[in-house]
Amino acid sequence: MKSTHPAISSVAWTSFSTGVNPAKHGIFGFMERTPNTYDIYFPNSKHVMSKTVWNMLRDYNKRSVVINVPSTYPAQEMNGVLVAGFVAIDLARASYPSSIVPKLKEMGYKIDVETQLIAESKDKLLDDIFLTLEKRTQAILHFLKNEAWDLFIGVFTETDRLHHFFWDAFERNTPHFGARFLDYYKKVDDSIGKIVEGMGDDVTLILLSDHGFCELKQEIYINYWLKTEGFLSFKTSPPKSLSDIAPGSKAYCLDPGRIYLNVKGREPNGCVSPGDEYEQLRNTLIAKLMELRDPETKTTLIDKVHKCEDIYRGKFSDRAPDLVIEPKHGYDLKGAFSKDLLLSKGNFTGMHTYDDAFVYVSQKNLVKNSVEIIDVTATILASLD
């Protein structure tokens, strides 16, 4: 299954839950621009501009239980139960109705893995990944059994955390962490088995991931590249935010590879004229990005560069990035403003991929040969028809 551009959780899970592309639901990344400014904000559930599948079903008096779907925080009123996922920070605001909070606290429910534990030890982080899965499974089984539902959605985001920090252990089958990686998946398999057992008869089962994963070789800092190529400069060094962008800058990047041109009439200090200059600059950036290579290995780093109109269609197209970079597998794109190098690597050893997300549907007649994550909403609705 194909994910979204970019293949990140806020965009992919919102596309999954609404069945439309980002130009219709309004979420293009973990950070968004405030229109006509250089200010950045973190979008949440209140910024989703399309109806979710559970609210579509609400119109037909169908009840849903939604556990841990990213970008559903803060929890909104619905017909059923919702426990928000990443980037939820407060259990009370993550829960609807509020009456479920005492039960969640009683079972020791964990909103997310405490990834900062990597600074102490890998084993402590892994222990927390296992614990979070245990508590997530406990909550899912509780609501599966004790709530009435027509649609039930439960998400295990712990797999994402495991892959980001321990993909190298899996790839290399290292004795300790490689074994624990596989042990975790045995636990996932056990959890899925318990969920299937608790679903009851005549229920369509859909399993999916919002993106794929592969080994992370290097992180690419696109704003550094834009600076070295003369397309971007800042008034301060190091810059604290995008608002430090200097007059005359022609382009900038937000995570994970969204390039925005500094357009006259759109940005406060825009210098790129709409029309021919805009198109010429986009074409120049595409050509240069496609030539970008790892200085040491000489490997090309970019697979494709998409123009916004080729991948986004909808009423919020004017908020879309002008270009979206799709990297080669192994090269993760970053939008940091203060980095002074092209390539680097942090704690992550695994990265998201676009073209190999997973989907399984137990009702075979609902599946077509070419599937994108935005198709899942229609599949859910068809299964309930």
Spans of model-derived segments:
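Short secondary-structure boundary/capping segments
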Residues: 81-84, 168-173, 219-229, 275, ...
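His/Asp/Glu-rich, glycine-adjacent segments
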Residues: 20-174, 250-300
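Extended hydrophobic/aromatic segments used for targeting, binding, or gating
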Residues: 165-169, 173-194
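Short, structured active-site-proximal loop/turn typified by the sulfatase FGly-forming signature C/S-X-P-X-R
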Residues: 1-20, 63-65
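Metal-dependent active-site segment of extracytoplasmic phospho-/sulfohydrolases and closely related
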Residues: 186-226, 301-308, 316, 324-326, ...
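Active-site neighborhoods of enzymes that stabilize oxyanions during catalysis
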Residues: 50, 57, 235-367, 373-379
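Structural motif
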Residues: 151-155, 206, 360
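Short, solvent-exposed loop/turn segments at the edges of secondary structure
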Residues: 9-11, 78, 221, 226, ...
